[in-house]
């Protein structure tokens, strides 16, 4: 049960534990609680170059279009600010990935357009006119779980890693 999750408490220099369903016991009267209703998306895309090198692209924030709802509806092209894993193996050129979607093979391409500090502007294009970027992330993306969990993403994480209030796609971690 989700309400049985561990709740860490800090009071007067001491740390103790409880469970989430008892959170109201620890909140002062008149407190305001703000709930995050965004769903964590499958924002990690794993590509393999023809040389065998593996490149991970972690979509952080949409650039074109900038609105999450709009970028998920895009067909054929969108741009994101991304982190790139194993960047030294991706000097130039397009990365390509075959994605199986409703019995069809869609070719997803990624092109590194420019550096943005520690991240990169990546343009994604694909060859299927009715396939949305949300469809591609659902089919080919991996849910980004924190590295401190020391494990790969599991299928059950698609539900259990979300907050109980999550409705709108848009979080990446």
Residue ranges and their predicted role:
Residues 1-173:
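A cross-family signal for N-terminal binding/gating loops and helix N-caps
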């Amino acid at each position: 049960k989700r309400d049985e999750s561990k709740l860490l408490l800090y009071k007067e220099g001491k740390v103790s534990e409880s469970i989430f369903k008892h959170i109201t016991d620890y909140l002062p009267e008149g407190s305001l609680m703000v709930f995050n209703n965004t769903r964590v998306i499958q924002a990690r895309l794993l590509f393999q170059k023809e040389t065998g090198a593996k490149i991970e692209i972690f979509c952080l924030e949409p650039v074109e279009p900038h609105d999450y709802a709009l970028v998920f509806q895009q067909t054929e092209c969108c741009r994101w600010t991304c982190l790139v894993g194993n960047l030294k193996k991706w000097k130039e050129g397009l990365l390509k990935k075959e994605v199986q979607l409703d019995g069809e093979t869609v070719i997803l391409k990624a092109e590194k357009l420019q550096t943005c500090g520690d991240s990169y502007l990546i343009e994604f294009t694909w060859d299927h006119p009715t396939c949305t970027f949300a469809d591609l992330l659902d089919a080919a993306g991996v849910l980004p779980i924190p590295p401190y969990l020391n494990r790969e993403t599991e299928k059950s994480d698609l539900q259990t890693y979300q907050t109980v209030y999550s409705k709108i796609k848009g979080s990446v971690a």
